[in-house]
């Protein structure tokens, strides 16, 4: 059973990474599953240069909003979001 959960978490992590890369094509993205729909994400992109942390986070959250919306949303929370320019 734990393997199924891990596989599902890995699939969602891949969806998160894909959604972020679609919105921020040059991004280096790392996603870590924390369990029960919780994730930690790190994103490095030139797009973030000269943007405030709030603006950087807004770009990422906009990209993953579909994964956080609805009763059966696979992403419950972003426990940690790190964004920075290279």
Map each language-model feature to its residues.
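Short edge beta-strands and adjacent turn/loop segments
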Residues: 22-40
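C-terminal structural segments of small proteins and small subunits
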Residues: 61-86
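Short amphipathic alpha-helix segments
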Residues: 13-20
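Short secondary-structure junctions
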Residues: 20-28, 70-75
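Solvent-exposed beta-strand sheet faces enriched in polar/charged residues
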Residues: 30-32, 42-44, 82-84
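A short interface-forming secondary-structure element
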Residues: 42-57
């Amino acid at each position: 059973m734990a393997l199924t959960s891990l596989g599902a978490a890995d699939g969602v992590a891949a969806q998160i990474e894909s959604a972020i890369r679609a919105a921020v094509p040059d991004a280096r993205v790392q996603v870590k599953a924390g369990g029960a729909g919780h994730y930690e994400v790190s994103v490095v992109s030139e797009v973030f240069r000269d943007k405030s942390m709030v603006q950087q986070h807004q770009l990422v959250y906009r990209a993953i909003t579909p994964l956080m919306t609805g009763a059966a949303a696979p992403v419950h929370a972003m426990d940690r979001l790190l964004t920075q320019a290279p």
